[in-house]
Amino acid sequence: MDINQLIEIVKKKICVNLNIEQIEIQDKTYLHIKHSTHQKDKFHIKILIKSKYLQNEKKIETMRKIYKILDQEIKKHIHSIQLKIN
């Protein structure tokens, strides 16, 4: 899977499962390329979400929801996730 495919899957899953107004996903894999733990087919993504619904939740609860939604992608294709909720 390439990064563009992963981004589309992540967007779709989050949009279907959470009440959001807007989502942007950025590839930040370049930040990890020289790390000893870097794996070729694992990506670092930054997820920016605009959601009044999620703003009212504790960040840890939002993270748990997103990790549950993206469970398969995290196991196979995601090295790390940065999350920002507005």
Q: How would you name each of these model-derived features?
A:
Residues M1-N86:
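N-terminal, polar/charged subdomain of small-to-medium soluble alpha/beta proteins
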